[in-house]
Structure formats: structure tokens, C-alpha cells
């Protein structure tokens, strides 16, 4: 295939450094992610290489020009997310920026990948949503941001955040301290996320009034959760019985989000409640399953590589096991 060449010009009035990033960081990140050569001199940007990739780069810079015109500067981390959106057939990557879930103390929480955007859209349009994927994909954080936003808009009367408390083979009865002290370490990730989104004093006040509840999954038994946004975290550590119990707590004007990662199961020798739930509920109306992938990991670039390395290790181990079985 014959190489393609184009020349782009940074629009008048836009500082090229806003487009290319500090120290040309955006430019370097871009070249590492596309099959094209990109050279910037002054206000000119020359792009050459695979025709499809050249077109992709042109669309990327159209997005970068719009961001710069609005006073925003892309970071090197933004490049891979933007390219992923454009490669997926979207014509404009700004849909992620425009979808603000929550603003707190000048910090904006929004989906950062197309997978996250689809997950958020699924939560908005379904009563029950399962968010499945590896660590760092924002499953719980985005769900909690939507929950807090719903509470602030008075769409629901309370938030309920829950997770199984028996993990890593530990039995709470054998741990020292009061029940609250035993439970607190398991709930801490939920507290941390909540304090990222709301004033701590206000959060404490709402918790005292029962408007926000953070409790172990076992505390959901026998209840009907109405007028509530409920998030069940670490669902891979539920049993099938616990999962059924939780799902049947649904009341009127409520929304349930269940998050989990099947690669991080702590249940030993037992089947978890997340393993078969898509086969059971996959065709039930108003229930959505959103699968987040490694491309949706946004914590730190290294987290994505760690997840990828573990997946490769697990795949290789499974292949060796199959080979041994076939050789017998």
C-alpha cells in the first residue's frame, strides 16, 4: 500500500505547545501509538505513513485543535485514550470530555475511555448493571460518582454501598476487635472513593442520618432497598446464594450496580456468584452487562502492563495444562 502524506497547520491564535504537549510529549506519545511519522515545525505538522493511520492522526489533531482552542491541553496519557475512541469508529473524542458525572472542589469526574463511557451509559439506562473487568478500569469509582450525583440531584433518597467482608480466607470471628473494627478495613476502599467526591463532614452527617450507608453484604439480608442507588463491590467474592439474595433486595425507584473482577476471586474451593450470572440474567430486560477491558485501565500505565502480564501468565499456564492433558 502506497504511503500517504498530509500537512496540517495549527490554527491561528493557538499556541502549538497546547497541541503538542509539554516538551512535545503528546507528539512522542502519538508516534509510539500509530504507524505514521509525525514531524512538527513551527505551526506546521507533517504526517506520513499508512493511509488509514495518517487519517487517524489527522482526526486526532482536529480534536487537539478544538481542545486547545477551548484552553485545554492534552497530556501524553490523553493520547492513547483519544486514539482508542477514534479507532473504535467514533468521529469525535470530545464525547468523553463532555460527559461530566460529578464535579467536586474543581475536580471533574468523567469517563476517560470509550469502554467507560458505554459502562456509564448502561448504568444510566438500566435498573441493574453489572460492571465486569480488571483492576483500574474505574468500575466502582464511576458507579459511585453516578450514585453521588443521583443523590445530589434528589433522584434517590439514599446511597447504599456494600461488599462481601470475608476475603482472603479470613473469618471475621477470629479477628481481634469489635465488629465495626473488623469490618472497617474491608469497607475502606468505599470510604476513600466517597471522600474523593464529597466533603468529609457532610458525608459523616449523611451517614449518621442513614442517607449514606456503607455496610457488609450480609447486612442486606431481609431488606427491601427502595428509593436508593446501591453499589455492590467485589462481587466475585459473593456466593451464588448471596448474589441471588442481593439482587432480590431491589425495591421501587432504585438502581443497582454490581462490580467485579473474575480474575481476583478470593473464594477458595467454592463457585462465586458472578461466574454464571450473565448466563442466568443475560436475556432479562433492564439488566445490563458491561465488560471493561485492559484498554480501559486508567490508574497508571504500569497497572495496565501488570494486568496484561498476569493475563499472559494465566493463558500460558492454562495452555501448558492442556498440553499435558493431551500428551497423556
Residue ranges and their predicted role:
Residues 39-96:
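Interdomain "pre-motor" coupling segment immediately N-terminal to P-loop NTPase/helicase cores
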Residues 15-32:
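Short amphipathic alpha-helix segments
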Residues 32-39:
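A short, structured beta-strand/loop element
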Residues 19, 57-60, 243-246:
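Hydrophobic side chains in well-ordered alpha-helices
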Residues 83-99, 315-328:
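Intrinsically disordered, low-complexity linkers and terminal tails enriched in Pro/Gly
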Residues 1-17:
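Short glycine-/aliphatic-rich beta-strand segments at the starts of folded cytosolic domains
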Residues 44, 104-116, 120-232, 236-328:
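Conserved helicase motor core of SF1/SF2 NTP-dependent helicases
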Residues 13, 51-52, 237, 297:
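Short, surface-exposed acidic/glycine-rich loop or hinge patches that mediate macromolecular interfaces
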